[in-house]
């Protein structure tokens, strides 16, 4: 059985696999690449405990009839290393004695292949998905994952939620104390659905498409999330449809007061608090504006800074909160004026840029002063 393929194309596909799986534990699955030969193309597949990757190469010549296919496993390291240094036309011959020979103009290289009977099955998208452009969607994902903190709640999540509604998509990320809702207009939804996307799968999209403007199809079968672009299919395994009910939290928020201020000025004030403690006390009133204070009683350290506010609606308010909690929340918002709503009933703050009110952060404060 023979197939002829351009080495530069194989190297491009295999280098993507190398980037995806360079840090995983090697075993009989992750150390092999599955190759399936069809009469008009080659399918290359790899997987680890969470991600599966499928890509096709159509610019090939094979001696397989249109009603046949043949699949085999080849050592990933061997295959990647060979094509990294051979970009010319390569003739691949698969022999019945479990040897595989790569022939090129200056010589040949031989190795071995094994049967794929024990290799896990690959799953493929079923039904329609949502379609987004990578240029805007990937930036939104980056903001969502950069927002969440490394607390004890995060390992249970490590995912963002794509909540697809009739006219928009909410991209939601959370940790123990915060919710970040990034809303995008979307007019092509066939039905409302919830899709989970892991941080692992998202990082693959960053690597592949961060500098491209490519359409991505995203769908789910309820257990896996599928990402499709160009000829690539990425399956994000073990993604169950369970996520904190963020809509309940958002809907119960009742505003008691509201203050408008400059985003960058508050960031500067919060950065000053690093000198003392990780908990800051925030007071808002018309006379003094916004006052941020941090105090370490044991070491007799205290810092306090004030900044003007642009407008205050409702009574003055105060709260305590983790510095990194509020700092990363403010940073996640678009530059310019920022509005902070305070809910006295639930001791929560909601922050957003008034020009983009549908993208906002909800923070649970620690306690009232």
What role is predicted for each listed range?
Residues 156-164:
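A glycine-rich, acidic short-motif signal
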Residues 1-150, 166-369:
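DNA polymerase sliding clamps and clamp-related checkpoint/processivity subunits
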């Amino acid at each position: 059985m023979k197939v002829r393929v351009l080495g530069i194309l194989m190297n491009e596909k295999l280098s993507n696999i190398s980037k995806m799986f360079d840090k995983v534990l090697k075993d009989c699955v992750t150390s092999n690449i599955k190759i399936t030969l069809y009469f008009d193309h080659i399918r290359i597949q790899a997987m680890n405990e969470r991600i599966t990757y499928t890509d096709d190469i159509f610019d090939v010549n094979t001696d397989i009839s249109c009603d046949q296919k043949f699949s085999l496993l080849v050592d990933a390291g061997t295959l990647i290393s060979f094509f990294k240094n051979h970009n010319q036309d390569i003739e691949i011959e698969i022999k019945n004695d479990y040897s595989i020979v790569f022939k090129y103009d200056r010589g040949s290289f031989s190795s071995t292949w094994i049967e794929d009977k024990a290799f896990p099955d690959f799953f493929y998208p079923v039904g329609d998905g949502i379609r987004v452009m990578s240029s805007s969607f990937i930036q939104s994902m980056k903001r969502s994952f950069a927002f969440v903190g490394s607390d004890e709640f995060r390992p249970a999540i490590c995912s963002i939620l794509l909540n697809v509604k009739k006219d928009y998509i909410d991209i939601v990320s959370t940790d123990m104390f915060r919710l970040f809702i990034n809303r995008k207009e979307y007019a092509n939804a066939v039905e409302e659905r919830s899709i989970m996307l892991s941080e692992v799968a998202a990082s693959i999209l960053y690597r592949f498409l961060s500098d491209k403007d490519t359409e991505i199809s995203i769908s789910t079968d309820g257990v896996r999330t599928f990402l499709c672009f160009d000829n690539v299919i990425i399956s994000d395994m073990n993604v169950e449809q369970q996520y904190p009910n963020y809509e309940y939290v958002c809907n119960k928020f009742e505003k008691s007061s509201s203050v408008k201020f400059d985003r960058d000025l508050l960031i500067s004030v919060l950065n000053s608090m690093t000198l003392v403690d990780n908990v800051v006390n925030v007071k808002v009133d018309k006379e003094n504006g916004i006052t941020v204070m941090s105090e370490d009683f044991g070491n007799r350290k205290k810092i306090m800074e004030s900044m003007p506010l642009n407008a205050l609606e409702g009574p003055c308010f105060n709260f305590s909160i983790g510095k990194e909690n509020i700092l990363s929340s403010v940073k996640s918002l678009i530059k310019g004026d920022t509005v902070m709503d305070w809910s006295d009933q639930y001791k929560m703050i909601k922050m957003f840029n008034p020009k983009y009110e549908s993208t906002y952060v909800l923070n649970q404060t620690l306690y009232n002063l």
